[in-house]
From Swiss-Prot:
Name of this chain's protein: Phosphomethylpyrimidine synthase
Broad enzyme group: lyase
Keyword Iron-sulfur among record annotations: yes
Cofactor(s) for this UniProt protein: [4Fe-4S] cluster
GO molecular function: 4 iron, 4 sulfur cluster binding; carbon-carbon lyase activity; zinc ion binding
Gene: thiC
Amino acid sequence: MNYKTQREAARKGIETPEMKKAAEKEGVELKYLQEGLAAGKIALPANRNHLSLQAAAIGAGLKTKINVNLGISRDCSNMEEEMRKVEKALEMQADAIMDLSCHGKTQEFRKALLAISPAMIGTVPVYDAMGFLEKELSEITVAEFLQVVETHARDGVDFMTIHAGIRRTTLERLRKTPRLTSIVSRGGALLCTWMERNKAENPFYQYFDEVLDICREYDVTLSLGDACRPGSINDASDACQLEELITLGDLTLRAWEKDVQVIIEGPGHMPLNEIEANVLLQKKLCHSAPFYVLGPLVSDIAPGYDHITSAIGGAIAAAAGADFLCYVTPAEHLRLPSLEDMAEGIIAARIAAHAADIAKGLPGASEWDWQMSKARAELDWESMFKLAIDPEKARRYRAESSPELEDSCTMCGQSCALRNMKNL
């Protein structure tokens, strides 16, 4: 094999099995996908050690993808429960799963996940560092941070969040212009603490070339983390966030020089009216690299309903050009999500992604909606259930009611507009 990464293969005009599979899934020409990979506008996360992977691509002109977060923690360390979530996420057509495990047998869980998942798998190595190394944060050396990155890569992880964009200069800016909610990124806060305690630069920024060498060796896509993402709408689009974004743009070019694929992570909490501008800024400053957003959550008042605030922002962001949505569940800001929380979050994210694909004018995006509308016009309930994004819920709601007329529902009964027009 005379290439190390999908990007290198694309630049050399080599058609890889992963490219062919991804192009077939998307219904696009292989050449289009290949050119997008070579230009950095598309990423195809595919670690050569992830043997169960069914490759999928993220980026310009492709369907908006969704990611599901899960993993074990100190308070919730039940691996069996998290594996049930994995199975449910795959059943519900998640495109990617991020293992955010930060305590316990993290490598055991990660390997089990990689063994069964056809979806791409992402991790955040800095989360795992203290548990894996069994050391206090400030005592971890640069070499040990890199060791954890390489362990994740060797295990088969397809993409990794690396918070390389937050620097000591960013901390100085944060002191000069304080935020309402400071740093809310877990990885960002860990690195801020490490930098302050050791009076040193962010190790992932200072030793970025070493990170790139690891990513290149295993073809791990670099998901450049937004340590300065706003944790409240009050802090959105501030200097701290934008300073980091400029740094991420510079790091993107350095990664591409080594043929390492890149995704850029984005906000966060953000008012509706700022979302489109932020997407345009990211595409401009980060050279059209795929954009991966957490939400954005368009309001801060809805604990228990943040899958809704997130879906609103995600639909707007993706319609404006974001490529990858991280789901948010009703449990956001409250607890580790349950299986039921996860399912609600997935449906909300999938609706947002699909709505955005229609707005983007992707070929075939509205065909699903046409089929559903046709079934409704014909009062074809069975087809409606099969076409629903959540068939189980649609069937349950219908079964819980007893309409007077079998082909109507309990909302309108004999006054059903479609039924009456059909019978004219």
